[in-house]
Every structure is written in structure tokens, then in C-alpha cells.
Amino acid sequence: MNAAELVDRAEISDVVIAYATGLDRRDWSLYRSIFVDELEMDFVSVGIPAGPYSADSWVRDARRLFAGFEATQHTSTNHVHTIRSDTATCVSNMQAEHF
């Protein structure tokens, strides 16, 4: 692995970390910054229908949902990166606590 690949991996992990940090700090600008304008989300396991969403509506709905919690903690571990040319995937374990 060369230096450029290590930088790519770090930048990809930074996006995953910003996801958790944005939610936990209620930093909605940070949270919005990690998304492209149109997303494909799947949170069926918690009752949110899978499908396409606009990033703005996703963030707006998250903001509404998280207003009901006093605190949250999202922890992301075991980042596994697959990088091919200009396409990358990061699979990680996310543990979320909502209080």
C-alpha cells in the first residue's frame, strides 16, 4: 500500500466518522456535508423505508428524530475499505446508543 492509498482510506473513514459526529453533536451542517444530493438509504431494521431520499430531507428528518433524545453516541469500528479507481466502499460496524 502506498501513501496515496493510505490517504484515500483515511479520507473515507473521515466521512464515516463525520456521520457519527454530526449526529451526536447535532452538527447538521457537518452531517449534511457528507452526503451527495440524492441518496439511497436502507434503515428498514428500525422502521424507516428503504429508498431514494434527497439529502436535505434526510437531514431534516434526522434532525426531527434526534430532537427527541437527550444524548446519543454512535461508535464506528472495523473499517474495511475497497477502493477501485474512483469508486470506494467502506463497510464498518456501527453501534448506536440513544438516551
Role assignments for model-derived ranges:
Residues 1-37:
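Short, low-complexity N-terminal intrinsically disordered segments enriched in polar/charged residues
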Residues 28-96:
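A solvent-exposed, acidic/Ser-Thr-rich amphipathic alpha-helical stretch
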